[in-house]
Amino acid sequence: MNKPLIRTERNGDWLRFGVKVQPRSSRNQIVGEHEGDLKIKVMAPPVEGAANQALQKFLAELFKLPKKDIRIVRGETSRHKIVEIRGIEAEKLLAFIPQITK
């Protein structure tokens, strides 16, 4: 299986990348890559920030980081978001994706 190409960049201590969120899913999961962004399904509806909170919680649990180390920097009302995570390197993010999407 080829490694998905997720565009990432450093912003100081933070790793920045795009996420396409699909709310109201049957479970929280990474489903792969979508146009250079990480595609993630969350169970929460896109109402009053519930899907954003679910996304932050899911990523924090996935990477074993506190929620304060996950932030949405753009796209709070859109399905296309820019997310930053403090405490991981791009290699860890990219290496982790195939394990989930197989």
UniProtKB/Swiss-Prot annotation:
Superkingdom of source: Bacteria
What family, per the record? Belongs to the UPF0235 family.
An example Gene Ontology cellular component term from the record?
A: cytoplasm
Q: Which NCBIfam families match?
A: DUF167 family protein (TIGR00251)
Q: Which Pfam families match?
A: DUF167
Q: List the disulfide bonds.
A: none
Q: What PANTHER family does this protein's entry cite?
A: UPF0235 PROTEIN C15ORF40 (PTHR13420:SF7)
In Swiss-Prot or TrEMBL terms, this protein is called UPF0235 protein Swol_0959
Q: HAMAP family attached here?
A: UPF0235 (MF_00634)
Organism this protein belongs to: Syntrophomonas wolfei subsp. wolfei (strain DSM 2245B / Goettingen)
Q: Which InterPro entries match?
A: DUF167 (IPR003746), YggU-like_sf (IPR036591)
